[in-house]
Amino acid sequence: MLTTLCVLASLLGCQHLPIEGFTDVQSQIVHQARIQGVPPHIALAVAEQESRFKPTAVSKGNYGIMQVQLGTARRFGFTGTAKELLDPNTNIKYGIAVLAHCYKKYAFDLMSLGCYNGAITFNSTYIREVLNKSKKYQLMLK
């Protein structure tokens, strides 16, 4: 039902519906995750792990909340500048698009998170930390 409301809100031009107990950024992440078929608790955990939800985070060519690389965003249709990846809505949209691609490719959390992290050899610490963070969001979204 909530997924239907998110899709309907998107079609009507609304960015997202606020979710009680979540910040605006977190609500947007849940909204995009549901639209793109990614488990929302995993998307929230990735954003927390990558930037602690900080829209202005920049590190080694990674930008914004989801720490998206410009070249990666371009592969998913982004035509803007690196600075534009710092816009929370833009960053979340493309970050979750990458995560959705990884889920379609690997279909389960461990491999999908390794894919998102850009690993040729999977970073088990990153995966473990994201999965641990995801547990609290899974409980909050029930």
Which ranges hold each PLM region?
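Catalytic glycan-binding domains that act on GlcNAc-containing polysaccharides
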Residues: H16-K142
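Bacterial Sec-dependent signal peptides at the C-terminal "C-region" and cleavage site
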Residues: T3-T23
